[in-house]
């Protein structure tokens, strides 16, 4: 069977990302090892262009999406128009247990004129601290941002975010920006994380900017009492806290679509967004997982399940392609006989 260059590249990516051995992965895909390593050597030497064949590519694509899957993807896109092609692809795999790639979803949506420009342009923030975290609760980022309630004025949202997983541990809508507001939010984070109830060798390190509430002696004393160390970002360089800065922009892109006339209305909308962000929003930097799955240690189980779905789907499409090709060949033989 002849494969197009794009199909070869997809198989190479699949083998590279597989959680099982190369031999077992290729066996499940029905690809001889000698064939795969020939492709791989050409790919490493000449990039994707090296996978092109000199002879014309086959007319029939073996892993084309079935019509029923195409309609299901379009239905999900119409049901949840706020999702990007990447988020739609991951959501479809998790919900339907059938693999579709981001590229396939993008081409499908584009063909049906369902690709739209974002309502807001997000400025890029630095995503990595100088000393990257390797597990939850090693480093917490915290910051304030402003939100307005009509007839009441400005309120200040204090948030604590886990650096490793981006999980929102705690938030508080405040009328001031004092050290007490900060320590109250941190106390909620300690309770929500469970660290308040257990003895741990190292408490999370806190990362903040140099605002008055963060450099105060009152907060410093509170942190010492609770066994936490404190790192402050470089002055006039807010991108040190890239993850919480990005969270604030994502949150405001949704929250500011509505007007609020009572603080309680704003708090309710914030609670809804935090729940969505933590539990249902796929993050590309987290291998397309929501923060809660990473924070609570479910990541590897989900990624392994997705990999199995991908292998099973590709094998199913390959079998269907062979069946279709065999049926077509039989029909042609009957016509010519």
Model-derived regions: residue spans:
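Residue-level signal for the short linker/turn that defines the boundary of a DNA-recognition helix
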Residues: 19-21, 83, 100, 261
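Acidic/histidine-rich, metal-coordinating catalytic segments
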Residues: 186, 197-216, 234-236, 287-292
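Residue-centric detector for conserved, function-critical "anchor" positions
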Residues: 1-79, 228-229
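RNase H-like polynucleotidyl transferase catalytic core
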Residues: 203-210, 224-243, 257-263
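Mobile-element integrase/transposase regions
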Residues: 68-69, 98-99, 107-161, 167, ...
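C-terminal domain-tail junction helix/linker
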Residues: 2, 224-228, 249-337
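Basic, flexible linker segments flanking DNA-binding modules
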Residues: 41-139, 237-238, 295-302
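Short hydrophobic alpha-helix segments
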Residues: 171-172
